């Protein structure tokens, strides 16, 4: 399971002309689900995302996590994160989970995060437009 996390001052996701998810200060999480992923990996990733210390403390040091700053999470499904780009000039998505498993684990991951912080979501399998202001910029690739 892969999460590309970005520290944001605000972010939103639209489907068509409708805003389906929006947050203020917090994290934009682009979530990719792979074939061998399961709930235990989702638990581990949620724990890491919620506790990853990438927000600045009073001394300007990255020392605080999302919960400590009262931040929010916008979670957007991103199957392209599971792409195999080793060969050729076209990505292969053979490592990605089938849509049914991916959606179940996406929803489960969102629920786990929502136990601790406010969560907004994109729309699974939709063509979305994501807007954000990356604070820093601060971006990390987490893979469990």
Swiss-Prot record:
Record EC number: 3.1.1.96
Domain of life: Bacteria
Subcellular localization: Cytoplasm
InterPro entries on file: Daa-tRNA_deacyls_DTD (IPR003732), DTD-like_sf (IPR023509)
Top EC class, one word: hydrolase
GO cellular component, one term: cytoplasm
UniProt keyword tRNA-binding present: yes
UniProt keyword list: Cytoplasm, Hydrolase, RNA-binding, tRNA-binding
MF annotations from Gene Ontology: D-tyrosyl-tRNA(Tyr) deacylase activity; Gly-tRNA(Ala) deacylase activity; Ser(Gly)-tRNA(Ala) hydrolase activity; tRNA binding
Motif (Gly-cisPro motif, important for rejection of L-amino acids): 136-137
CDD domains: Dtyr_deacylase
Catalytic activity: glycyl-tRNA(Ala) + H2O = tRNA(Ala) + glycine + H(+); a D-aminoacyl-tRNA + H2O = a tRNA + a D-alpha-amino acid + H(+)
Pfam families associated with the record: Tyr_Deacylase (PF02580)
Task of the protein: An aminoacyl-tRNA editing enzyme that deacylates mischarged D-aminoacyl-tRNAs. Also deacylates mischarged glycyl-tRNA(Ala), protecting cells against glycine mischarging by AlaRS. Acts via tRNA-based rather than protein-based catalysis; rejects L-amino acids rather than detecting D-amino acids in the active site. By recycling D-aminoacyl-tRNA to D-amino acids and free tRNA molecules, this enzyme counteracts the toxicity associated with the formation of D-aminoacyl-tRNA entities in vivo and helps enforce protein L-homochirality.
Family assignment from sequence similarity: Belongs to the DTD family.
NCBIfam families: D-aminoacyl-tRNA deacylase
Quaternary structure and partners: Homodimer.
UniProt note: domains: A Gly-cisPro motif from one monomer fits into the active site of the other monomer to allow specific chiral rejection of L-amino acids.
Protein name (record): D-aminoacyl-tRNA deacylase
Organism per entry: Histophilus somni (strain 2336) (Haemophilus somnus)
